[in-house]
Amino acid sequence: LSQYSIRDYLARGWLTHDGMWFYNALNTLGIETANALNRAAIRSMAPMEMERTMTMLGITPGSLTTFPELADFMIRALDMVLPASILRHYHATIQPPDTFRWEWEPGECFAYKGIKLAGCVDRYSCGVIYRIGCWFDALGIEYRIEPNPDTCMMHEKGYCRGDIIVNLPG
């Protein structure tokens, strides 16, 4: 087995665990509580996730002071978190001087697919883009998301894409 296939297998396993956790919370507690718990877990995890990612990439806190440095870090962080078999359906482009543009291929967001199977996509609060926002919060970087998907954009509009505009000091 290649390192690529093992890494992809393990990362997909983590996403399956995440999905099954949400599914069981949904069935036990209802959609509102499952959404709230999911977002609370994401927010709680983000500081640890960013600290570990920075350590693995040899980046010191406070050193992401330019947009190119931040953009490179965020792309590498996403590459570490998402399995390649899923990441190939997600496209991030950098729009200097301050914008990350994201887009999922139509119907290919892993959360959309899982939540659709669970039968509650019409009431799901997007956790994927929320997680990226929490990463910026954990890094202490001001940003805004346009549009900011509180619900599942793929379900509502047939696509999921938007911009994250950052405001670095200086």
Stretches found by the model and what they are:
Residues L1-R101, A111-C126, R131, E142-D163, ...:
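N-terminal accessory segment detector
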Residues W104-E108:
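Short loop/turn segments at strand-loop or loop-helix junctions that form parts
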Residues L139:
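Conserved ATPase active-site switch/coordination loops adjacent to the nucleotide-binding site
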